[in-house]
Each structure stands twice: as C-alpha cells, then as structure tokens.
C-alpha cells in the first residue's frame, strides 16, 4: 500500500497499479491504503490517482508479463515467488525493483538508477535517461561497387515510391543506369 501511495501522490494521472491473483492480499492492501491515506498530506491527489488506476485482479498468472509490457510502467515493483521468471519476460519498464526491501523511493533517491524515466507507457519505446543521451553519435557508411550494384534496385524502387527522383538518380548515376 505504501508503494502504491508513493506513486499516486505525484499527481492524479500517476499510474499506481497493483496486479495480483491473491484476493486476500488485495483486501489487505485496500485496508492499509485507507489507513495510510488518512495521514497523507496529498490525500486528495493520491486518492484520485488510485481511483483512476488502483488494483487489478489477475485471473491467469501466466499473462502477467504481457500485462506489464502493455502497461510499460515507469517503475515496476515485483513481490512474488516468481520474480526471476517474470523479469525474463519484461521488455517494457523504466526501472524494476525486486523484493520487499527494494521500494521505488530507494531507486529515486539513492540506489543509482536514473530518476528520469519514461512515463505513461512510453517505456514501450524508450528508456530512462542515461549517459548515452549525452553522447554524440554518427553513422559511417562505406559501400563498395559490388555493394551498390546489389542494393541499387531496392534503393531506386523506394526512392521512386516516395517521389524522390533525385535520390534514385544519385544511385543510378553510380551504376551507370540512366
């Protein structure tokens, strides 16, 4: 419950979701949420966020990684007997926290992973900010005569399809196809 609140207190759009197949756990978390929210200075924000997202009952444990990858959470906390199995299937999450002694707040403030993470499902196509975002990269392309001859028809067809005749001609002229 505390970890759900830690996410929900950010704003009403914060995605704080508990997914479980254990109805007793869900009941216990709901009771704990009620108690903890009473003391929270940002109670209104957290309560609205939890109403927007909150708790999902999982009927098929095998679909958990599929659900995680669709949600693509900014923070994923795993508290199961099957953490290692689940992690192998997770492709879309900003940061992953494993076990009851690894709350997201530790990752935000002191454990070392970046706090700038993809939110609102954007972990499906991006990662957290890293040193790579501050590096300048470039591509070097060197094609041989044989290489351009092999690639020319594909490039020419694509260029024509995009109505970029200059692109097509820049390849044709190199292989003497006018």
Language-model features, listed with the residues they occupy:
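Short phosphate-engaging motifs
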Residues: 25, 63, 86
């Amino acid at each position: 419950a505390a970890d759900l609140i830690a996410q929900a207190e950010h704003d009403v759009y914060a995605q704080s979701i508990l997914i479980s197949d254990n109805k007793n756990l869900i009941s216990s978390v709901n009771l704990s949420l009620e108690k903890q929210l009473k003391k929270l200075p940002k109670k209104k924000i957290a309560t609205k966020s939890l109403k927007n997202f909150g708790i999902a009952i999982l009927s098929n444990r095998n679909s958990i990684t599929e659900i995680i990858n669709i949600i693509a959470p900014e923070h994923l906390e795993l508290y199961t007997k099957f953490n290692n199995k689940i992690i192998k299937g997770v492709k879309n999450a900003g940061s992953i926290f494993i076990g009851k002694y690894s709350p997201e707040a530790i990752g935000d403030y002191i454990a070392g992973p970046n706090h700038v993470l993809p939110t609102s499902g954007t972990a499906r196509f991006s990662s957290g900010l890293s040193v790579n975002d501050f590096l300048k990269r470039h591509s070097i392309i060197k094609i041989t005569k044989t290489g351009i001859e092999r690639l020319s028809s594909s490039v020419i067809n694509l260029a024509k399809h995009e109505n970029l005749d200059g692109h097509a001609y820049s390849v044709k002229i190199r292989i003497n196809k006018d």
